[in-house]
Structure formats: structure tokens, C-alpha cells
Regions:
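Hydrophobic/aromatic beta-strand elements that line small-molecule binding cavities or substrate pockets
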Residues: 21, 62, 76-81, 94-96, ...
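Short beta-strand edge/turn micro-motifs at domain boundaries
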Residues: 108-135
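A short acidic/glycine-rich loop-to-helix N-cap element
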Residues: 5, 101-106
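Beta-strand elements of well-folded, non-transmembrane domains
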Residues: 26, 96-100, 115, 132
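Short beta-strand segments enriched in hydrophobic/aromatic residues
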Residues: 37, 94-96, 128-131
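Short, low-complexity N-terminal intrinsically disordered segments enriched in polar/charged residues
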Residues: 1-39
Length: 135
């Protein structure tokens, strides 16, 4: 993981939060995601045509994925963190390989997560994927 672009402590803190979020689902504890999500978080489909709203629904999407998938590979690269007062945008490239119903999928793309700082705590408020490709 190249984190040379993460210069400030706040940028590094946000990247650490993003990694904690990913560790929750990747390591099989997706219910813990709720502590990182704002109550009204919005997940967008990669084409931005569909949305899921709310901490419970978005957390459940990870649970459903893990219940139907076996993760074979997951990597994050090129993190970028932009901070604007109480708003932050975290992006990174990812590669994932997983199995569902005896079929293996291999995808790459960019994850985009927007955070809002409330009472000295960063909460994820918006997420989407971009550049999603089957490898």
C-alpha cells in the first residue's frame, strides 16, 4: 500500500478509518460497520441510478454479500484523501476476486467514500464505486 500521498495526520486518520471499515467486512465482521456509518448513509450503484439509504440497509448489503460469497483476494492501492473542513472524500483503487455459486468473479475499480465529521468523529455518509471492470 502506497500511502505517500497521505501527508497530514487527519488524512492518515481517515485512511485508517477506511481500512477499519474494509477490515470489518473483509474479515467477516460486517455488523461492526454500523459504528462507522451515519444513520442516513447513502450507497449508490456504480451507474448512480440506484440508491440504498440508511445505516441498517447499507450494513445489510455487506452481510448479504458475505453470506453468498467467498473472498479469494482483496487489495487496496493508491489511497487519496481530500479534507474540506468537516467533509472528507476518500478514494482508492481496489481489486477483488470472489466466488458465488461456484463461479469466480474478478473485479477492479475505484471506491469513493464521503465522510462528515460530527462531534469529533468521522462518519461515512456516501459511497459509490467507479471504473468497475471485470478483470
Amino acid at each position: 500500500m502506497n500511502t505517500e500521498t497521505l501527508i497530514t495526520k487527519d488524512q492518515q486518520d481517515l485512511w485508517n478509518i477506511m481500512q477499519q471499515i474494509n477490515n470489518c467486512w473483509y474479515k467477516g465482521q460486517p455488523a461492526q460497520l454500523a459504528e462507522y456509518f451515519h444513520d442516513n448513509i447513502v450507497f449508490n450503484s456504480p451507474d448512480l441510478k440506484r440508491q440504498s439509504t440508511g445505516k441498517d440497509i447499507c450494513t445489510q448489503s455487506y452481510i448479504d454479500f458475505l453470506n453468498s460469497s467467498k473472498i479469494l483476494l482483496y487489495k487496496e492501492t493508491n489511497p487519496v484523501v481530500h479534507i474540506f473542513d468537516n467533509t472528507a472524500i476518500v478514494t482508492y483503487e481496489f481489486e477483488i476476486k470472489y466466488e458465488q455459486k461456484d463461479k469466480v468473479y474478478h473485479e477492479t475499480g475505484t471506491d469513493i467514500m464521503i465522510f462528515n465529521k460530527q462531534e469529533n468523529s468521522w462518519k461515512a455518509v456516501w459511497r459509490s464505486l467507479a471504473n468497475l471492470k471485470s478483470a
